[in-house]
Amino acid sequence: MTDRADLSTDVLVIGGGPAGAAAGYWLARHGVDVTIVERKTFPRDKTCGDGLTPRAVHQLGEMGLTEQLSKYHRYHGLRATGMGRELELQWPSHSVYPSHGYVVRRRELDQMVAENAVAAGATLLTGHEALDPVIDRGFVRGATVQTKDGTTKQITARYVVVADGANSRFGRALGTFRTREWPYGTAIRTYWETPRHADPWIESALDVKDRNGNPMPGYGWIFPVGDGTVNIGVGLLSTFRDFKSVNTTHLLDAYAHQVADRWEIDPT
């Protein structure tokens, strides 16, 4: 079904995640008519460790979000663990960047940045998926978008920013692609309740093992969220010979059992 109520804007941003929403914010702040289209609706979740580095904290502060960020759990650095040893690496002092980060769940962070773009004057269309580019004399001048009810319309623009992620359908329509021979990673995470939810360090383990105790070419993480839970996850590289046979859910379970006593979680 086609709806002919087409739209026009100066800049069309494909993707309303932190990158797209930040682009929309700065464009709107400078008086540009900008429209952001996002396939999902907020709040929506993403697989992520939820950790914001000092550079990210600085950039979000430049966007006026310092007060909102201060409500979340602050951490001071990274604890690296492996082979029975650990090393606490505090964020260094810097003339521009703070010496702390925050842990913010993505379902909250992404909505915060998107709403901030709207407050700056950007138009945000959620539940709108960009299907195909609008091409005019060899230039990308917008997109055909589809809403959840199946209606489609064209949004034309002078400029288009493609920010819909690594698996960009819109990008593929423009001819971009991922070289299959290149390495890539996959990750899985969940949240566990623990009294250590406000630990001042995020943690990364360099000695993740599978259920049989075999070392794996990846890493594990534990990021305290400060709300009674920690974000626990594992990441794995495709360079591993048996990568495709690995069950990441089982790997996460093995890692949770590996850290259960120290982090006071119940992985059962």
Language-model segment annotations:
Residues A19, F42, N167:
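Conserved Rossmann-like nucleotide-cofactor binding loop
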Residues D3-A19:
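Beta1/beta-strand and adjacent pyrophosphate-binding region of the FAD-binding site
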